[in-house]
Design a protein with these regions (language model features):
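Amphipathic, hydrophobic secondary-structure cores in small proteins
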Residues: 13-17, 23-82
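Short, flexible, solvent-exposed loop/turn segments with mixed acidic/basic and small polar residues
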Residues: 1-8, 36-41
Length: 83
């Protein structure tokens, strides 16, 4: 079934692991991205990111942008829903 030409909506959450000394800066950077929210951080350098975007391409672009932030160690997707 093709979704071409149809509106899509993607909700995704994941854990971002980063260097603890960069945690606050990275959280602020992620929070400033379109469709992104940040939640639940800890002092060891982990926080939850929530993305609500209109295409799978935008989702991949945003996750890639987060992974390329200096000090990010990795991202682990926890949930993804698309309509």
């Amino acid at each position: 079934m093709s979704t071409e030409g149809k509106e899509q909506f993607h909700i995704s959450s994941f854990v971002v692991r980063c260097l603890p000394e960069r945690l606050q800066d990275i959280m602020a950077t992620v929070a400033s991205m379109p469709g992104a929210e940040v939640h639940g951080d800890d002092a060891r350098g982990k926080f939850v990111a929530l993305l609500e975007l209109e295409s799978d391409a935008a989702l991949v672009e945003t996750i890639t942008a987060i992974e390329l932030i200096q000090g990010v160690v990795n991202t682990s997707m926890v949930y993804h829903h698309a309509e």
